[in-house]
Every structure is written in structure tokens, then in C-alpha cells.
Amino acid sequence: MNVYGKNDEGVATYPYEQQFEAVQEEDLQLNQDATKTSGFPFFSILIWSLFTTVISGVVPFIFGLVSPQQMQDFYTGWALHQNGQIYTDYYGSNGLLYYLLIYLSQGSILFALAEWVALFGAGFFLFKSANTLTGQRGQARQLLAIFYLLVASLGFGGSYAVIVAMPFLFYAFSLIADYLENPINDKGFLLVGMSLALAFFLSPIPTLLFALALALMLLGFNIAKRRFVHGLYQFFASALGFSIIFYPIGYYTVVTGTFGDAISHTLYPVATLGLLSNTKLIDNAAFYGSLALVLGLLTLIVSGIVQSKPAKQFAISIGANLGLLVTLALLILSKEPLHGSRLAAILPFMTLLLLISFKEGSPECISRSRRRVRSSSLFSRYLKGNFYLPVVAIVYLLFLPVLSRYI
């Protein structure tokens, strides 16, 4: 019984300050949940993807700035209308679905439309992943801007197979991001495998490296959380999903007798790697290595390893760092002609490293019912942290083909 304002034993006492803090914490949690589920920047992604398509695809095609490898792919699409089979009669190191797209579009405006749709899808799933993992929509928007600028420059005139594969790569990552954010929910891994299979038939080697990176992310996270059984289930579910897509499409190469040629052509860039006998090694190391440093890859790699992060972000950094380093090594050891667009293969890994570099906001009390989270700009940190050298790299990659052709 309460007499003269005194509380009986067992009845909790909540001073005004504690009640006020509890209300604020509840409001902050509600605001964070609402932030994660609303405000998809549809119009921004639509415009950015259109801009990137025009810069990376339309402008090089109109002015004859397409890379030799990409021009060969366009020629293959035209030649398939005349006669012959891909892989048997014409060389191709990309996937079967990619050459089907080239065949259907014949290098016309339809291919640019397909690239636009692919870039829109990539931006959609990238934003979804960033929002799921961090809940910081402002920095996720800045990540989209950096991503599209990098695609426009690194994909200028070539590596379109990687670009059209990115929505499937980022869709697979978005499903894994859902699991990393909420380990209780590990559904959707069948779709992870199916999405990676579709990406494989567009751009095989980058997809295999990205799949390896995702596997390392899950392995590291499951070890940290002691979820070994879940890891086995995820592996077999992903493998089943991959098989559902791989075998029906791959069966076409068996029927046409091009299976062996398809494997050899796909692995040709890897089979011809050289160290001591590679006359282009020094040029490759200087060109790709310098661009990698100027783009800030060293900073991203070091920060991904050194800075303390939650388990989910640290797991992402392990896979992304390994995928990035292996991709750079393949470029340096390659005997293929130098071209800036070949660096587009690093984009999926570089984007993930940028994603985990988000800074946590510092909450400040604005009123009894609101809190505003102020976070530093991802765009400014990326540029200032690398002394604005990424701007130099972007301008260089955009104007180098122009100077090489017309001057």
C-alpha cells in the first residue's frame, strides 16, 4: 500500500530522468527501424544509371572509343547472325548469356537499354544491402554516387559483361546481408546460388571470385557465431540453386558440342598468366597498380583490416579484400592488352569495402521525442582520405581513350 508518497517493496522506482531516457531510446529504435524500411531513392538510381550508361556505353560506341576486346565481342554478335557457333567458330571468354545478349542486340540501342536496366538493378540491390547492414540512408546514397561514377570511368568502353552481371552479384550479396544482419533468418540461399549462376553465364571469372568472397564472408561469420550447421546448410542450398540454373544452360553447350571449347575459352585468360615469361608484366604492374593506388584501394584494404568493426562487417572485409587482391593479381599477370576498362572487375569488391567504411553517427538529443544522427560524409572521406586522387583517376580513365585515338 502506498502511504504519503512512499513505495512498497518490490515496486520499481523510475525517476523522471530514467523515464525520459527510456522514451528517448524507444524513439531512437523506432526511427532506426523506419529508416531501414522507407525512402528508396528510385529517381536518383534511375538518373544515375542512365547517366552511367550514356558515359560508359553510348559515348564510346558513337565516337569509336570501345576497347579492342569489347569490339571483338560486338563483332562476334554480328557474325553469329551469319553462321557458326560461339566458342567453336568464334573466340569468347565471357558467358553464354552475355553472347546471347550481344546476339539479340547486335550492338544496337537494345544493348544500351540492357546495360541501363542492369545498372538500375545493381544500384537497387546495393542500396538495399547498405540500408540493411547500416540503416544509414544518407551514406548509402553517397555510396551509390561513388559506385556509378566508378562504373562510368572504369567501364568506359569495355568490360560490359561485368557490368550486366553486377545486379545478380549484388542481389546475391543482399540476401547474405540479410543473414548477416539477422542470423536467425538464413532463408534465400537457394536464390543466392541461382543468382550467381546467372552472373556466371554473363561474366564467369569475376563471378567465381565474387562467389569465393561471399563464401569466405559466411565462413568467417559462422565461425565467429559458432553456426557451423547453418554454414553447411547454406553451402548445399547455394550449390543446389547454382545447379538448377547451370545444368540447363550448360546443357546447350553439350548438345552443340561446344562444351570443351567453352571451358577452354573461359579459362584462357587464367591459363595464359605468366610471371617470368610475361613481357607485359612491368607495364601491367605500373598501369593497373598505379590506378589501384590512386583510386584508394590501398586505403580501403588497410582500413578494412585494421579498423575494429562488428562481426558482420569484418566478415565482409575478409572476403572483399581477398577478391580484390586476387583480381588485381590476375590483371597484373595477364598477357591481354592494356585497357583501363579491365579494372571494372574490381568494382564489386571495391564497392563492398566502401560499404563497410560507413561511419557510425553520433546521436544527439534534439527534443523529448526526436534524435538526429549526424554522420560524416562518405563522399568527402573517400576523396579527402585519398587526397582527391580518385578524381584524377576518373578523369584520366575517361580521357585516355580520347587522347589515344585522336591525338
Identify the residue ranges that each predicted region occupies.
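Aromatic- and kink-enriched transmembrane "portal" helix at the membrane-lumen/periplasm boundary
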Residues: 99, 108, 145-167, 201, ...
